[in-house]
Regions:
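Residues within membrane-spanning alpha-helices of integral membrane proteins
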Residues: 91, 95-98, 121, 143-147
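Transmembrane alpha-helical segments
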Residues: 72-73, 121-133
């Protein structure tokens, strides 16, 4: 089915999941909790009065971190017309797995769910700059994006937390 390969549909799914996260719709956390055992459900459904709960809530820092490759991929696919089927597959997979995290964002230890998409993050950012002909200074741009990503990651790890 050709529409399954179109990134715009995955972006619509991500936007829907973002709105659900913004509105704190708990339906999806309860739905996902039904698929797991009690310990897994405990992460998704928690008592907000419990002070031992990991930092939860609307994580703007995580959303910014996750949105950067979505924005870069959007620019490359729709504005620069990168036609690589492999890149579109990796990009769509990243957007889809990140969408699942958005639905569970208010759960405890949500970064464990986000890691499923974040492992693809460097590939989504760098792959087209190494394997596609985009423009003359693409290697420099790719290196700057990689350094920016590394800098933000180190900032979040050592300064922010």
């Amino acid at each position: 089915v050709s529409w399954v390969k179109q990134p715009k549909y995955y972006l619509w799914v991500w936007a829907f999941c973002f709105v659900m996260a913004l509105l704190d719709v708990s339906f999806f956390r309860h739905l996902f909790a039904g698929f797991t055992d009690d310990s897994g459900a405990g992460y998704l459904i928690f008592d907000s009065a419990d002070e031992s709960v990991y930092l939860t809530g609307f994580r703007l820092d995580f959303i910014i971190y996750s949105a950067v490759p979505i924005i870069v991929g959007y620019y490359l696919i729709f504005k620069r017309k990168v036609e690589s089927e492999r890149y579109r597959f990796i990009y769509n997979l990243y957007v889809l797995t990140n969408s699942v995290w958005l639905l569970c964002m208010y759960a405890s230890y949500t970064n464990r769910i986000a890691y499923l998409s974040w492992q693809l993050l460097p590939i989504v950012l760098i792959y087209p700059f190494l394997n596609e002909r985009i423009y003359a200074s693409q290697y420099r741009t790719g290196a700057l994006i990689a350094l920016g990503h590394l800098g933000f990651t180190l900032f979040m790890a050592f300064v922010y937390y």
